[in-house]
Each structure stands twice: as C-alpha cells, then as structure tokens.
Regions:
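PLP-dependent class I/II
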Residues: 1-163
Length: 163
C-alpha cells in the first residue's frame, strides 16, 4: 500500500497506524456481538445448530452401524458428543482408496489423513467425516455410498493379501 498526502496528514496517519495491529476482522466481530448479544444468545444459537446437525450425525452413525458393523473389523468410528466431525477408521492402508472410490462416484470427502500433521496418517486409516453442510437427504445418500466404498476397499485389500 501507499499513501500520498501532506506532512500534517502523514503525521496524523502515522499516529493512527501506530496503534493498529494485524488481527481478525473487527467489523465481523462487531456484527457477531450485536447479533448474539451475550452468553445466552450464543447458547440459544448453538442450540439451533444442534437441532439441525443431530439428525445428520445420526444418519451417518445409523449407516455405519447397519452397513459396516455386520462386516466385522473393517471399520470403527467415534461417537462425538459435540463438534463437527466423526472420525472413521478403516482398515490400515485403505483410507486413501476409500476417498478415491468416493471421489470416482462424485462424493468429495475431507482428504484422507487430514486430521494428522501434514495429512500424513502413518496407517492410512483415518477419514474425517463432516456431515454439517449437506441436507439430511444428501447425508443419508452419501453415508450409504461411503459404506459401499469402505466395504469395497476392504475386500480389495483382503484379496490382495491372499494373492
């Protein structure tokens, strides 16, 4: 940036700039404060989020329980009590393959190993599932597809080990 101004204006601007810091968007913070008002406002707003998100999380967990649990030890997952993610652990060496199978079908997941530093999951087993943005119908369809991809990747791995 550059400023073209008089000496007096430059002194004024230097004084103003001396107290500025690089930080978050103050106007956006002000909008949040005005909208949420206080702790009760934050809690009420978060309750609205919860009402919308719980059915989506339940849909994912239902699909996992119905479609993956009967398959034995091919996957396990977390049961979060809050937050925005479910951690899905597939067979070691399969997370990237599951993500690719999903992508090939048109389903974009958070990258395999994304919860690890530099996205380097040493076991290639972790997928972070975020059912927070899509509609409930989309989450249900995506969960079913994800389960198919987990099962297919597991079968591919088991067959490769037998060969």
């Amino acid at each position: 940036s550059a400023i073209a101004c008089s000496v007096d204006s430059m002194k004024y601007m230097c004084k103003r700039f001396s107290v500025m810091i690089i930080s978050y968007d103050k106007m956006n913070q002000l909008r949040h404060v005005r909208f949420l008002k206080n702790k009760e406002g934050v809690l009420a707003h978060m309750a609205k989020h919860r009402r919308r998100l719980v059915p989506c999380f339940d849909a994912v967990k239902t699909a996992f329980n119905e479609e993956l649990t009967p398959c034995g030890d091919i996957a396990h997952w977390t049961n979060p009590k809050g937050g925005y993610f479910i951690s899905l652990y597939v067979m070691p060496g399969c997370a990237k393959r599951v993500a690719q199978l999903c992508k090939d079908c048109g389903l974009t997941l958070t990258g395999a190993g994304s919860a690890y530093p530099y996205h380097k999951d040493p076991d290639d087993a972790h997928l972070r599932i975020a059912p927070t943005y899509p509609s409930l119908d989309e989450v249900e369809t995506a969960s079913d597809l994800l389960c198919v991809c987990v099962r297919l990747a597991a079968v591919e791995k088991l067959l490769a080990e037998k060969a």
